[in-house]
Design a protein with these regions (language model features):
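Preferential activation on post-signal-peptide N-terminal prodomains/segments
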Residues: 27-233, 260-262
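Short hydrophobic short-linear motifs embedded
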Residues: 2-6, 56-59
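Short, solvent-exposed coil/turn segments at beta-strand boundaries
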Residues: 147-150, 155-162, 215, 242-251, ...
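Alpha-helical interaction segments
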Residues: 11, 60, 316-317
Length: 365
């Protein structure tokens, strides 16, 4: 989302497509940390994977969305950091909730749909594919598929859930403006109020493009809050992703993020200012999956920074959920045929947590 909020990218030969797992919190979270103990050191590095690099292709950076509640003039001294209890390894396979807990989430969603579950099936960890040093032994459930007559409900081991509408039609056209998209989301919020269960919705939409210029629009909503920190958490961890049908007045599927329910709060960590983070970025102190050959030979300069925001990395491949300043940097032209006017932006991260709490600062090559 995020809301690009949270993201993995395909190889450059395919379209640069930001993947967001979205939704709402369905079960309680947080056990308070021991305030008498010192905050443990954190590892700010993260796995890039083998799926290319994080980036966007846009005609204008404004198309990336503006619903992030963080602003540069926001005064934040600390932000919470969480241990991801569903983490297994760099593959991101989520294993934490019991089979009964997975079923409980599915039953709750079915009740909001006024539907009865008629079949269930659990996907389990294959012992032959376990990575070294994993905490798993094999056979653990990492996903539940629950079917009703009209819906298929998928619940992952970290609480994330997807509802697929078995009667879905053709997906809604991606070629919509931001205002058209917001109107569509408003219609869906009214029609599916019981399922979506959002009291104070913040509507969020953004798009990116394929190399040929085909627009790919995303539709999201999250719960507003008067507390700025809680609103930041809602934006990063509690998005609801909507896929409209062709008419725009019905849903093809909806996704709910719930991973914050499978965490332990480590503590509230002091964070650096955005100005300090930007200085680190310009000094080359950043984390990125962008290959160096795509960056201009002069490195990152002020005029290359197209967008700045504060986010949490929330994918299940992360052992720790911690905040980062994220920067979108305009990359140099690549040797790939692209639609006229289309620009490539690479994503660069600077940890928001103060350096004295990072074990790997400042070496992140």
């Amino acid at each position: 989302a995020k809301k690009p909020g949270w993201t993995k990218w395909g190889a450059m030969a395919a379209c640069l497509c930001l993947v967001v797992y979205a939704g709402i919190r369905l079960i309680p979270t947080d056990s308070p940390p021991d305030e008498s103990s010192e905050l443990p050191l954190l590892n700010a590095q993260f796995e890039g994977g083998d799926m290319g690099f994080e980036g966007l292709m846009l005609f204008d950076i404004s198309e990336s969305g503006t619903a992030n509640p963080w602003t540069k003039n926001m005064v934040l001294e600390t932000l919470p950091v969480y241990e991801n209890l569903a983490y297994t390894d760099a593959s991101g396979l989520p294993v934490y909730l019991s089979e009964n807990e997975l079923l409980g989430i599915a039953e709750g969603i079915a009740a909001r749909l006024n539907a009865d579950i008629i079949s269930t099936e659990y996907d389990r960890v294959d012992p032959a594919q376990l990575s070294p040093n994993t905490r798993l032994s094999g056979g653990e459930a990492y996903r539940l598929t629950a079917k009703t007559r009209e819906y298929t409900i998928l619940v992952s081991g970290n609480g994330d859930a997807v509802v697929e509408f078995n009667t879905q039609g053709v997906l809604f056209s991606d070629y919509t403006s931001e205002n058209e998209a917001k109107t569509i989301i408003g219609t869906l919020l009214e029609k599916y109020a019981s399922l979506l269960s959002v009291d104070e919705p913040v509507i969020y939409t953004w798009c990116d493009y394929t190399f040929t210029g085909e627009q790919l629009r995303r539709y999201f909503v999250y719960e507003d809050d008067t507390d700025p920190v809680q609103k930041i958490l809602n934006y990063n961890f509690c998005l609801i992703g909507l896929t409209p049908s062709e008419e725009g007045g019905a849903l093809s599927n909806v996704s709910f993020q719930n991973s914050l329910s499978c965490t332990d709060k480590i503590g509230d960590y002091p964070i650096i200012t955005s100005d300090a983070a930007r200085e680190m970025l310009l000094n080359g102190e950043y984390i990125t999956t962008v290959p160096s050959e795509y960056l201009h030979d002069t490195g990152i300069s002020e005029e290359m920074i197209a967008k700045e925001e504060l986010v949490y990395r929330t994918g299940n491949a992360n052992e720790i959920f911690m905040p980062y300043y994220r920067y979108y940097i305009e990359l140099k032209e690549i040797d790939v045929e692209m639609a006229d006017g289309l620009k490539s932006y690479g994503v660069y991260h600077v940890p928001a947590v103060s350096a004295e709490y990072l074990v790997d600062f400042p070496v992140w090559d």
